[in-house]
Amino acid sequence: MLDPNLLRNELDAVAEKLLARRGFKLDVETLRKQEERRKVLQVETENLQAERNSRSKEIGAAKARGEDIEPLRREVNTLGEKLDAAKAELDQLQNEIRDLALTIPNLPDDSVPLGKDDTQNQEVTRWGEPRKYDFPVRDHVELGEMAAGLDFAAAVKLTGARFVVMKGQIARLHRALSQFMLDLHTQQHAYQEAYVPYLVNHATLYGTGQLPKFGEDLFHTNPLSEEAESSQYALIPTAEVPLTNLVRDEILDEESLPLKMTAHTPCFRSEAGSYGRDTRGLIRMHQFDKVELVQIVRPEDSMQALEELTTHAETVLQLLKLPYRKVLLCTGDMGFGSTKTYDLEVWLPAQDTYREISSCSNMWDFQARRMQARCRSKSDKKTRLVHTLNGSGLAVGRTLVAVLENYQQADGRIEIPEVLRPYMGGLEFIG
């Protein structure tokens, strides 16, 4: 959520920047009319409150003098009714302003390249050389089925499309990947591991920006319920949601920052806008596992924190010896709440291309303002909004895809990366 003062004082400049850099058309006229009316109602409410207070004091004085106070009492009652009506209109208008503000994306950092879509992203660096194969390359689906470890037909029977049943050594490898990632981030990168709910309320989803704009991408547990919004839940699309909201409505000591958290969770996404895309295999699932990285930092530290967090995700790929590239997203490809994002794309031999395996973003104070997450300096005791960052460290299913395809042998066996062998009981090959 953008700073309301920015929208009030620099509305035209913000609208121009959003249109030029994001392709987002801000409804300037509506916002301007709402703000003008808000100012009028604010003054009217304050004047009515002051007049009502003044008349109420006169009642006491008149009563002490033995005068008839009934006319004054009627006047105070009338002022109270007008005040209640003005407050109600002001509250409704402020809610309308907030509802509109919640649909406005974050402003991109000036270092983000201009562009309309992913074709205009900028490659920053590459790591590792894709392996040359002297045999026909199999994709992860064929390899997983050869190892009797990926069963999509069973998942269709149990649930439907875009789900999978993993079995045997493939399931074990999937588990090993998540354990390896957690151990790396907690033991070498100083993240604190957390276990979080997989169901969250709507306030939590508003805090990180999934609501109100992306409600159709979520799995809601009771979408037709008439219960209060506070009792309605949705399955988490990423552990970023519960982890980041741990600081909602909190004031943190600046000396305690950065706060670095990680969690391994299943993630649930309806993929509402992805019909017909990546229908084969594990690339785009309704349910998938991910190890998430979240940092809560001082505002002046967030850009450096983005570089650090991205490096932490890169380390997973490097230790697994998986070729990848780092891409700086352009303005047209960034997420709704991000001010700057790096994507890490891993090499998939069967597709002969790089595919996203991690997205690392600096959200600036966009989420913090929604959550009212602040920090306080010990020296001057003043509070200010924190900055929040998040990234995949990594998506476990896509990492499994990359391991299966990059470590495949001519006979269909899969070599286990060296760093994973301690998690696999010393096993060197699957199949």
UniProtKB/Swiss-Prot annotation:
The pathway noted for it is: Aminoacyl-tRNA biosynthesis; selenocysteinyl-tRNA(Sec) biosynthesis; L-seryl-tRNA(Sec) from L-serine and tRNA(Sec): step 1/1
Gene Ontology process terms (BP): selenocysteine biosynthetic process; seryl-tRNA aminoacylation
One GO MF term: ATP binding
Q: So where does L-serine get bound? A: 238-240, 292, 392
Which GO terms of the cellular component aspect does the record hold?
A: cytoplasm
- Please state where this protein is localized: Cytoplasm
Under catalytic activity, the entry for this protein gives: tRNA(Ser) + L-serine + ATP = L-seryl-tRNA(Ser) + AMP + diphosphate + H(+); tRNA(Sec) + L-serine + ATP = L-seryl-tRNA(Sec) + AMP + diphosphate + H(+)
Give me the residues that bind ATP, please.
269-271, 356-359
E.C. number(s) listed in UniProt: 6.1.1.11
Sorted keywords for this record are:
Aminoacyl-tRNA synthetase, ATP-binding, Cytoplasm, Ligase, Nucleotide-binding, Protein biosynthesis
**Chief location category:** cytoplasm
Quaternary state and interactors = Homodimer. The tRNA molecule binds across the dimer.
Family under the similarity heading: Belongs to the class-II aminoacyl-tRNA synthetase family. Type-1 seryl-tRNA synthetase subfamily.
This protein's name:
Serine--tRNA ligase
Q: Which gene carries the instructions for this protein?
A: serS
